Amino acid sequence: MSSHEREEELRKRLRLIHLLHQTIDSYPTGPGTANQRRQRRRRWRRRWQQLLALADRIYSFPDPPTDTPLDLAIQQLQNLAIESIPDPPTNTPEALCDPTKDSRSPQD
C-alpha cells in the first residue's frame, strides 16, 4: 500500500470518527429534578464511552492485506480463458455397437 493510499485510508477513518462525534448530543443541561439530570448525565456518559470505544476500534483496525488468498484466486480466475472444445466423435466404438459381445462376462 502506497503512502498516498494509507493517508486516504486514515482520512476516511478520521472522517467516520468525526461523523460519529457529531451524532452525540452535547453534554446535558437543562431543567429537571436532580435525579433526572443525573440520569441524563449517566446516559450521555455511556454514549460517550461507546463512541470512544468505537472510535478506538475504527482507528486501530488493521489495514486489509493487499494479497489475500481471495484476491489471488480472483486474479487467477480472471486469467482463465475458454478454449474451443473439439467436436465429439461421430462414429461409435465397436465395443458399444456389438450386442453379442458382453463386456461383463468373464474372459475364458
From Swiss-Prot:
A motif (Nuclear localization signal and RNA-binding (RRE)) lies at residues 33-49. Residues 16-25 are annotated as: Homomultimerization. The keyword RNA-binding applies. Its main location: host cell. A motif (Nuclear export signal) lies at residues 70-82. GO terms for biological process: mRNA transport. Keywords: Host cytoplasm, Host nucleus, mRNA transport, RNA-binding, Transport. GO terms for cellular component: host cell cytoplasm; host cell nucleolus. Residues 83-108 are annotated as: Disordered. InterPro entries: REV_protein. One of its GO terms (molecular function) is RNA binding. Gene3D superfamilies: 6.10.140.630. The RNA-binding motif binds to the RRE, a stem-and-loop structure present in incompletely spliced viral pre-mRNAs. This region also contains the NLS which mediates nuclear localization. These overlapping functions prevent Rev bound to RRE from undesirable return to the nucleus. When Rev binds the RRE, the NLS becomes masked while the NES remains accessible. Homomultimer; when bound to the RRE. Multimeric assembly is essential for activity. This is Protein Rev. It comes from Simian immunodeficiency virus (isolate K78). The lineage of its organism: Viruses, Riboviria, Pararnavirae, Artverviricota, Revtraviricetes. The gene is rev.
